[in-house]
Amino acid sequence: MNQELTNNPFNPLTPPKAFDEIKVSLASPERILSWSYGEIKKPETINYRTFKPERDGLFCARIFGPIKDYECLCGKYKRMKYRGVVCEKCGVEVTLQKVRRERMGHIELAAPVAHIWFLKSLPSRIGLMLDMTLRDLERILYFENYVVIEPGLTDLTYGQLMGEEEFMDAQDAYGADAFQANIGAEAIREMLSQIDLESEANQLREDLKEATGELKPKKIIKRLKIVESFLESGNRPEWMVMTVVPVIPPELRPLVPLDGGRFATSDLNDLYRRVINRNNRLKRLIELRAPDIIIRNEKRMLQESVDALFDNGRRGRVITGANKRPLKSLSDMLKGKQGRFRQNLLGKRVDFSGRSVIVTGPELKLHQCGLPKKMALELFKPFIYSRLEAKGLSSTVKQAKKLVEKERPEVWDILDEVIREHPVLLNRAPTLHRLGIQAFEPVLIEGKAIQLHPLVCSAFNADFDGDQMAVHVPLSLEAQLEARVLMMSTNNVLSPANGAPIIVPSQDMILGLYYVTLAREGMKGEGMIFADVDEVRHALDAGEIHLHSKITARLPQIDEEGNEIMVRFDTTPGRVMLGALLPLNAKAPFDLVNRLLRKKEVQQVIDTVYRYCGQKESVIFCDQIMSMGFKEAFKAGISFGKDDMVIPDTKWTLVEDARDQVEEFEQQYMDGLITQGEKYNKVIDAWSKVNDKVTDAMMGTISASKRDENDAEMEPNSVYMMAHSGARGSVTQMKQLGGMRGLMAKPNGEIIETPIISNFKEGLTVLEYFNSTHGARKGLSDTALKTANSGYLTRRLVDVAQDCIVRMDDCGTENTIKAEAAVNDGEVVASLAERILGRTAGEDVFIPGTDEIIVAKGELIDERKADAVEAAGVTTMQMRSPLTCEAEEGVCATCYGRDLARGTKVNTGEAVGIIAAQSIGEPGTQLTMRTFHIGGVAQGGQQSFQEVNVDGKVEFRNANLLKNANGESVVMGRNMVLAIMDDQGSERASFKLGYGTNVLVEDGKKVVRGDRLFEWDPYTLPIIAEAAGTAKFVDLVSGISIRDETDDATGMTQKIVSDWRTAPKGNELKPEIIIAGEDGEPMRNDQGNPVTYTMSVDAILSIEEGQTVKAGDVIARIPREGAKTKDITGGLPRVAELFEARRPKDHAIIAEIDGYVKFGRDFKNKRRIGIVPADESLEPVEYMVPKGKHIPVAEGDFVQVGDYIMDGNPAPHDILAVLGVEALADYMIDEVQDVYRLQGVKINDKHIEVIVRQMLQKWEIQDSGETTLLKGEHVDKAEFDSANAKAVRDGRRPAQGEPILLGITKASLQTRSFISAASFQETTRVLTEASVQGKKDRLVGLKENVIVGRLIPAGTGGATQDVERIAKGRDQVVIDAAQAEAEAAAALAAPVMEDAAPDTDAAE
């Protein structure tokens, strides 16, 4: 019988079919019939009294199979022995009940019906095929109009629509047989079947060659694409209209009797019943020869019911069930979070899992977790049963069960055995990155809570305020091995996002270590000298010295040769104790811990130990400093009371000063010297300056060291220790407790002018409290919204990057990108060493001025090399990047460089795309969850000057300065750069100077740190006269292009340029100010162009008409945006916007060529800016700019490629088109990093590069040449290359194309894998498109493989696949050799037996 079972066709033991790809295409009626086991003729389901399926109904046993295993419906045949017999009484085959999950039926439709997906999913495929609009199609399908199919010799045209009346008239006029017209899906089906695809395609190609204009070729290309896809896939157009509807197996749409005689049923049964009822009624009406109008109505209803079955609600009203709930159609089963893809295929529930609350387990080792005995007993049951049986304690599973239930003592012993060395996985939701699931060895504990090691909390982002975690048991040996080798917490010391240690002490431990490493003057035992660690320990225990005394001690160290030597250090007993834990290594000297350790330094220590002392040592070290930190923090007994918050004495004088200032600004505003906006900005500035001063004063008071009566230094202030060490709290929080709360933000990000002067210690007034609720509430609502947004961003990132895997070792490309230090506002935010660390050099790097190589080309740069490059004074170098990698699929290990989480070169098969997505997505959620901690206190405040932070010499580049009447130098150019050079002549800092900046230093002048270089007005953009003369106003007409704004508060009026385009006669105006000379003619500037200034909307005029103007005077001011608060809330949408590659609203315009600016004729409400190229051979280019926008260039200005002709955020597409891939990558990396840096989050650049690579995978065809590619089509780079290579081989003209940038959502939907795209978004659209094209999914990415239930082709799954591939290749070699041998033998045999020659052929 066992033999029988294994051969059973429905037995899971049969090996699954091996397949390499999945193809989806349209099903022909014959195909549907071949799947079907019979036609369903009745709408009945089951008999409600006997619960037996009705014959020929939707659950019919004859069609779908028996309801009980090996038993026919009437009960004549039972048991295995009748397997495969068909009962002659009830017609049921005797077999397993499971076949009801896989046998399909069908419904023969009495009239054809159009498939709604191909009709309504835009663009309508049927419409494209027939070249008809969707509206016309619907009119035919839903029986409103006739369509001419065969005009004959009449003067009707093919495809013409006619109403009932027209049709009758035409029949009367031409006779009934002179032409053919029809209505409904039959007509459409007939038209589709008449299409000859080949000739249609040729015809369209001809049309395409002759087509002109913008829209026509586009339409032809769309049609050509669909015709070609039908040709290629072997689908027939008429299959888009169905004559047979398949019925899915009944077990997939179950009907379950509930108690009380009611039934619970799947919605599909209702939908199918509708279809069957209408179909049967239609059949009857046709037999009865009912009037046309009735039949037509029934056909229309049949069409509607089939539409509802396939996609309910896509057309017409939604069909609802008894409880007014819309019925779930077949499409809804696939779509969305609850659909088949995301609910059941990509996310499954797991057995052998449990969850419980977590508590801290400080006495655990790093690789352990505490597992409650109760949980362990339940999770490891099968293991315990088998062990009990093996030990002979029970003979059956039942007996073992009883033993376990009684919890006999031997069971606990066995549990201990089972658990030993069997890792379990712990997971905390939300799992934002791969460190959210880690493996630990369980330690059995009493109680019901899981114990978690404190050091891994930051990786899980866990705390012990009631968080829960889930436990999973890896069952198979392979799973245990992977858990131990890859997922063990000890193997995940470094963060995959930035390569820094993530197993870092926090909070109490940091406070303890900080306290241990404090050094204080005048403590007991100061100046004592100790011979070794033991003496120090002894003295401490005896109380002869204090933990913080300054002493000298002799400690063992390792010198460069690796010998142990004793070295004397000036240190403290606390530091000696900590130093004793440090592994002995030349690279980890005692100096590492011989300093005050704050959080950052502790991280540095762990990093160094991990890098140089190996994993084992560093894990032990981490555990030891953790317990030391806890112990010392506990012994120190640090706590604080309200007197520890010190309010500085100077606070009130500072506040009074600020109040005076603010009053002065109010007065200036009343007098009309400044505008409302300027006053607001100045007030905010004044208050934020005061706030900073008060904070500084407070910090000064708190951090000052105090002495007691014995002149010994006292312990620092507790609050200060906590904040300074990085254990908890920040200066901002201390400021609110002891300084002043400062300015608050409104929910929309604006800052409220009146600050909160009180702090929490003094207590807020009622008004202040009310003001502060604003920001606090915004913080809370933000948190809720942002979490969702951030999760969605991560999901899109994962989807776009999921098939980016390391596939090869080296692609051998010569392409590289440039690496240089990231400078922000003249401050180095990321040094060159940081940026090249863990990357592959793309060129030999020399010490400047010599030919000595520091790093050879193709070498992986480690910490030592990176520091050497930086020390040698190299400022830029070329490095390999995933962006420029030429691997066909995925990326290569050399371009990617170091695997950040391991510190070694990345392994083949590493899923770097997903790691990149997680690294970018995870902090998004983190940060957004943490906005509200500061309670909406305004951060930011505008800077209006730049100080230099290095010593050096000033150097101007592209200088364009003008001295104004006050003798200040004003920048007049667009691309002036001020650089600070050191003595060797290398650049230390550089600043881009905006138009209107006042420069305070001379070219070539020496500056020292802290000097002011230049200043600017942060709130307005000035327009400055470049020549002296008289001001003449042109088209500045009061009431049309100028409004006089009288300020209610001050009674002063200002002239402000208003939007003249809205005024009745405004369209022709071109408001500008001309500087005229003595003769009334406009002055000319150096280039010989007239000096005119075009005014933009909202500019405030600073001069009157006819006034005499000196060079450098401000003519008008354009207000900039007010100071908004900076917060990742603004940041997260910014990151999403960058990755979605959206064009910003008022995006900058980038010059495409070098040349001179020339203004052309204005056009409606746009201004035309042209660039006349410097290079004669190029065509001039023109840009249209909305009128009234400020244009920073003037007539005749010389612009270079990449200069902004209009200010704003550039659109990434433009950067790609004008400046190329590398510039785009730089822009994306800088912008994304700016957002994260603001929050102090470090992310390695390569993650962003990987995502940008995925966004750049498609090429847009500019000219199709003589290939099959079509103009405007988006194809993969690989496809583009192969098509071109083929064309070149055949001597045809290759296609031209250029890379395009797709946003992450779009890129995900355009992946080669339709399964992956369908499971992401817009499922119906993706599947419709795929089936028309007959797409094949080659299962390369991760998602497709998860969905079809395979191991993913990454990591260990990738390794097994490689082995299989190699084995297959070797098999093939053997087969080929055997075949060749046979052929050779045949060839030898052939000449002898000449008659038999044809036979040998046949034999072969």
Swiss-Prot record:
GO molecular function ontology, one term from the record: magnesium ion binding
Tagged with keyword Magnesium: yes
EC code: 2.7.7.6
Substrates-to-products reaction catalysed: RNA(n) + a ribonucleoside 5'-triphosphate = RNA(n+1) + diphosphate
Keyword rRNA-binding: no
Function in brief: DNA-dependent RNA polymerase catalyzes the transcription of DNA into RNA using the four ribonucleoside triphosphates as substrates.
Family that this chain belongs to: Belongs to the RNA polymerase beta' chain family.
Name of protein: DNA-directed RNA polymerase subunit beta'
Species of provenance: Jannaschia sp. (strain CCS1)
Gene: rpoC
